Amino acid sequence: MIGVLDYGIGNIGSILNMLKKTGAEAVAVTTGESLSACGRLILPGVGAFDQGMALLNQSGMRGALDEAVASGKPVLGICLGMQMLGLRSEEGSSEGLGYIPFSMRRFRPDGHPELKVPHMGWDRVEIVQRGASLVQGLEQPARFYFIHSYYAVCEDTGDVLMECDYGVHFAAAVHRGNVWGVQFHPEKSHRFGLQLLTSFSRG
């Protein structure tokens, strides 16, 4: 069973619908107890970093999520959910979850007046960790739908799963151990997103 954390700031319905298309069993979880009962977890999120961290901490699920990660359960962060997996963000002052050591920086299109912020729309990604389970069966070149103003900079380049270029090379997806994060929206990315979520659901 895949648990999608519902803490008041995520695109829950669209993610559940896409997971249903993969054939996976998935439910929205709102308590630490229901979270702990799931074998895989998705942390969605849209909006501001500090608000996301505050709502997650207030939800009563933070401790159970920490325990799930420590126990080796697969966890996938999406969009803001991915950003929260890291250490910090220039967008706010809150500490992130700290599961993967990366920080979020704001796009600064200096010298690239044609690039608008936020980075929005379809874009190509390059797979860095080609042997990772999450990218198996993914059609190449892979394209995903983005909407974000901040990008991840990993302290260890070995944590970069996919890269994208938008005036700067950035980590479009990250991976360390049982924790995965994607900056794009797989639930809005048609066959590419369907394949990625299928791979996550089957491990």
Model regions: which residues?
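Structural signature of beta-strand start/N-cap positions in the alpha/beta core
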Residues: 25, 40, 74-76, 143
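Cysteine-nucleophile active-site neighborhood
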Residues: 47-121
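Pocket-forming structural segment of enzyme catalytic cores
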Residues: 87-166
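Acyltransferase
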Residues: 182-203
